[in-house]
Amino acid sequence: VIYTAVTSPGEAGFVDDDGNNVGNITGTSDMVLADQQLKLIREMMPDAKKVGIFYSTNEANSKAEIAAYEKAADQYGFEIVTQGITSSADMPMAADSLIKKVDCITNLTDNLVVSNMQTYLEKANKAKIPVFGSEVEQVKLGCVACVGIDFVDLGEQTGEMAAKVLKGEAEAKDMK
């Protein structure tokens, strides 16, 4: 089995606590590099104190990403302020609420949140609150910057892994 764009392979049961593949399985992760993203935000916004994050309360991957941000926040002098949503209908009010509390917003690879990005991007732009993307395409859509995922590159990497397995050059369980 080869997976692609799984945010937290450990949470999904694909790798053990030491990061080793469980069984004959491997793949790629789209976990945001929280430490590097916060470093970028600090460089671009030296006076910022509070970083906002929207997340779906129904996505386990979002909780893993938030934990990574919270772990790295102190190093850069940030407080992470989260705002959960359960459906697209929640986003307008959630955006109004979070934007009032933060200096900027950073995205996760949360499907529900990203599918509603235009809603909060418009509100954030009006309030002059920068939004940092979680992947390259989001910058093209209006986010100010990102140290994030390029899903095309991630797909190519996963495809190369699959090709090696199919050609008998490697076993999934031995790949990282």
PLM feature segments, named:
Residues 28-35, 55-65, 82-91, 110-111, ...:
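Hinge/beta->alpha junction and helix N-cap segments in small-molecule ligand-binding domains
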Residues 86-141:
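Hydrophobic alpha-helical
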Residues 35-38, 66, 70, 92-95, ...:
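Extracytoplasmic/secreted envelope proteins and their assembly/folding machinery
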Residues 1-10, 27-29, 130-136:
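Short beta-strand elements of ligand-binding domains
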Residues 8-48, 149-170:
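Hydrophobic alpha-helical segments within soluble ligand-binding/sensing domains
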